[in-house]
Amino acid sequence: MPVYVQQKVLTEDVINNINVVFAYLENDKKSGGTALATFLRDSDQGIGIRLKKSHGDQIGCYWDDKEFRYNTDKMKEDIGSLEELLRNERTVVFAKGDFDSYNEQRFLEVSPRSYKYFKNRITKLLRIYRP
């Protein structure tokens, strides 16, 4: 099944589409984040893609590239879960607004290699599964 990119996902979208999985950005501590991330974290329909250590914009909240293998192992696991769902005919929705809300400049400053890996994996997933 396909992966869709929707500008904004509302809680009603999740509730009214029980067979759809919604991807959101997550952190290792599974705390904070957007209202959508908080809602999806507690939903069977949400799959978080870990991209940081913890919620916040301080440098310590971000993985750094000294932890590249650790960082990418977590991303591989999360993105791999999405790929498995797609191979099993599930529909996945990315909330573009949620992905746009993170601080790209901070990632490029603190963990450029890890961030590049993330962007490449997401781009590949969208290229393969987007209708």
Where do the PLM segments sit?
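Macrodomain-like recognition of ADP-ribose-binding/processing modules
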Residues: 1-131
